[in-house]
């Protein structure tokens, strides 16, 4: 069993992160994929992964909530992190119109930028969609044939 979407780099886990890992291993989880969702967490999951490199893997991307923060630095960081063996996917990226924490047009542009980056880096994508089905589907349909693989939640 693999947990594919663990946001364990978040500060809310600082006091009990090791206990969370211990319970997961005890329950039969064989590997955990730590989710990167912004510049800070992308760096954090890479460092956290090194504490158990045989069981912890990570993603790097910019969640739609953080799309307004996207800069060229994010693309450069994701490209750099993609060279590490433990980075198994780009994301979490996509569209989230439920809260609209970033403007929808910005979300779409950043989503497309990350899909194009995943294609160039030949990495699968970990996708997020909430209350944005039509736009999400249209964008994914345009890029799907070129993407190495994808997981949607």
Residues covered by each model-derived region:
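Mid-domain alpha/beta scaffold segments of enzyme catalytic cores
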Residues: 1-152
């Amino acid at each position: 069993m693999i947990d594919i979407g663990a946001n364990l780099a978040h500060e809310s886990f600082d006091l009990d992160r090791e206990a969370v890992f211990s319970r997961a291993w005890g329950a039969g989880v064989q590997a955990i994929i730590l989710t990167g969702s912004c510049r800070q967490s992308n760096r954090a999951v890479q460092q956290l992964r090194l504490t158990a490199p045989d069981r912890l893997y990570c993603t790097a991307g910019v969640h739609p909530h953080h799309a307004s923060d996207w800069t060229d630095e994010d693309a450069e960081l994701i490209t750099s992190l993609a060279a590490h063996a433990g980075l198994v996917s780009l994301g979490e990226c996509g569209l989230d119109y439920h809260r609209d924490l970033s403007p929808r047009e910005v979300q779409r542009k950043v989503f497309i930028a990350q899909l194009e980056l995943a294609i160039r880096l030949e990495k699968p994508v970990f996708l997020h969609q909430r209350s944005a089905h039509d736009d999400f589907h249209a964008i994914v349909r345009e890029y799907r044939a070129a993407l190495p693989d994808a997981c949607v939640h």
